[in-house]
Amino acid sequence: MFQDNPLLAQLKQQLHSQTPRAEGVVKATEKGFGFLEVDAQKSYFIPPPQMKKVMHGDRIIAVIHSEKERESAEPEELVEPFLTRFVGKVQGKNDRLAIVPDHPLLKDAIPCRAARGLNHEFKEGDWAVAEMRRHPLKGDRSFYAELTQYITFGDDHFVPWWVTLARHNLEKEAPDGVATEMLDEGLVREDLTALDFVTIDSASTEDMDDALFAKALPDGKLQLIVAIADPTAWIAEGSKLDKAAKIRAFTNYLPGFNIPMLPRELSDDLCSLRANEVRPVLACRMTLSTDGTIEDNIEFFAATIESKAKLVYDQVSDWLENTGDWQPESEAIAEQVRLLAQICQRRGEWRHNHALVFKDRPDYRFILGEKGEVLDIVAEPRRIANRIVEEAMIAANICAARVLRDKLGFGIYNVHMGFDPANADALAALLKTHGLHVDAEEVLTLDGFCKLRRELDAQPTGFLDSRIRRFQSFAEISTEPGPHFGLGLEAYATWTSPIRKYGDMINHRLLKAVIKGETATRPQDEITVQMAERRRLNRMAERDVGDWLYARFLKDKAGTDTRFAAEIVDISRGGMRVRLVDNGAIAFIPAPFLHAVRDELVCSQENGTVQIKGETAYKVTDVIDVTIAEVRMETRSIIARPVA
């Protein structure tokens, strides 16, 4: 009799609409229960039985129940699942398979089966890519996944690399394809094979894409020619190789090996500016005045060169610092190194006075054995030879930015707008509390930004600098010329790494159009989106592999008294993140390790400080001694403890 009763239906509808609901993200805990986080201030308890319907990270709508002053959430509707495509480790065998996602907060095995047409018999410990097919909030009985790709077996020494590349859906090897002959581009190439060009790189580098030649001019000025490898002389726009490079966007540099953007035959041989081999290049000739200013007579042209020496960073630095036993092979090469060091000094001073110079941070290099084991991690400080190349490249990129802006009005530009205007007042207020007075309007201009950066660099510690970092906007890739506040420059367009950056290949083609006096087509904005996304994925992949290798490297230090100097890089409610100075590893120090009495401890992300009994005990940028308490291999996390 109650079937199709309109009154009953109306009552149900009314009850439904009156029941309080909330949308938020599920946060799991290790104890079975969870929370529905609605915003930074509000969260609701999810009891263990209800947690079985959801997964950590799911965005859901839940019904809110109130019983005896306590509110709890009952998941009702899935807005966006946390897991769609993921990597994990297979459990079980044959017909009864499950997969545990490789994520620190997802511990439960998800029943699964191999997709049709996947010819691999999965067994315990295998790594796989899976896609979620069922979810309890979609009306399914349980979670269920489908294995779509076999990655590798559990004991493979190279798991960190293969799993990370599969996780981010990145290529594992160099692209296929060969370039048989140079294109006829209608360019007249200047023959510079007689000049003493040199390359300066790491000893192991094969893809040399820049060579330098310097000359002293009679009036105290210096001339610099930057010659850059010319892959667009081999790769036609729109060709198969070009399309592959466009998708990859960058060479992916991971600890231990790289996955090139171009076929290795091109990147490491045909285009690489090897010593004593004649190579086509795109070149830029510039004149530097005595104070390091780049004069207006910038000239881009096509040429052929023959590098006369493959020099190595450390050897060149040693020689310039009068240490070590390496000597340039001839007086001509020695003269080049001396002139390039002069150029470096002039340009460094010019940038210090008129733009911005980054603080030198060491690069960390993993030294790996045959089986991917970490033999050592060495900090490689940026020395004079690194700076020679850096100054030459920055100068060349400034030249390209100017020429493309003035002749075409577009190109592939690296743009950084400094501070987000919405944050200007908060920034000024924060600086004021530390005794620095800035105008909220002025700090949004290039000059105002540079002025502030110089004041911050003059501070005794980097603490204040670290506090304002959150107010900065991100660097972007744009087809429109614009300033790069981070470098303190009006415009910056890179063209010096075309073997490893697709944007630089585009700028090569545009510069060639300028050289030939032809009209050029503005690059489409989609390409900048693809490049930004690939750059993000490559950085995440590099970080993920690094985390894995750091965990392997420090595993045997866990629980020992070995001390490490560590810089505090971030403070949150739960504790502090630190970077080990000698090797670059990131470790976490939980709040209870800082002070046993929780009520006497205040960890403030806002202030970048840890206070104990009202006194500041730690702050971001402090360097402290730590020991390694624990290394959790399954999550690749390192837990440290301050030395008392």
From Swiss-Prot:
Reaction catalysis annotation: Exonucleolytic cleavage in the 3'- to 5'-direction to yield nucleoside 5'-phosphates
Superkingdom in the source lineage: Bacteria
InterPro entries named in the record: CSD, NA-bd_OB-fold, RNase_B_OB_dom, RNase_II, RNase_II/R, RNase_II/R_CS, RNase_II/RNase_R, RNR_Ribonuclease
Keyword Glycosyltransferase: no
GO CC term (a single one): cytosol
Class of enzymatic activity (EC top level): hydrolase
Gene3D superfamilies: 2.40.50.640, Nucleic acid-binding proteins (2.40.50.140)
SMART domains: CSP, RNB
Protein name: Exoribonuclease 2
Native source organism of the sequence: Escherichia coli O6:H1 (strain CFT073 / ATCC 700928 / UPEC)
This protein's encoding gene: rnb
